[in-house]
Amino acid sequence: MMSKLLVQSFAISIDGYGAGPNQDLQNPLGVGGPELMEWFFHTHVWRQMHGQDDGETGVDNSMAEQGFAGIGAWILGRNMFGPVRGPWPDDSWKGWWGDEPPYHTPVFVLTHHPRAPLTMAGGTEFRFVTEGIDAALDQARAAAGGRDVRLGGGVATVRQYLQAGLIDELHLAIRPVLLGSGEHLLSGIDMRALGYECARHVAGERATHVFLRRRA
């Protein structure tokens, strides 16, 4: 069976924004964007990523854990890899996460500008794909070895894959906050027409987790 393309633990505001306005090096999630991730910052999964052994182990943590299970490769939009725009000036930028990113698999980064692969500690290898979303998915599936592929974002990248009908399941972590502006995830996309339905929803401590699945 072909591996699935999954969006997991993707945080949005109650008014549908997946990032705030004015994203830059100081505000990678945009103004107000960190509020979207408050549900994740308290989990044991997040704390463990940062070398600590505390954090909450409730529903939100369980949802976050499930998002990493069975994943053999990731796909990221370029903005999820870093703030650099245009041609790469050099290879000095190595991602937001330090020497050992939390992926531990091959990660395919969508970009218009070629760059050599980048091997990091812990099994992460960033591979830069210039041929578009279909090529990135084909390469990720080949690298995943039968496991699923996780699409990490950002908003524009998820929208591209949604509009192409390529995402099998979308897990949204809906935060009870209003952003008012920024990058809207589903604006102008008819999810029903694309064949998606709400498969389940779970109330967590700081977010409501909604799973949208494409009908077979």
Q: What residues fall within each predicted segment?
A:
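Enzymes that bind and transform nitrogen-containing heteroaromatic metabolites
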Residues: 1-216
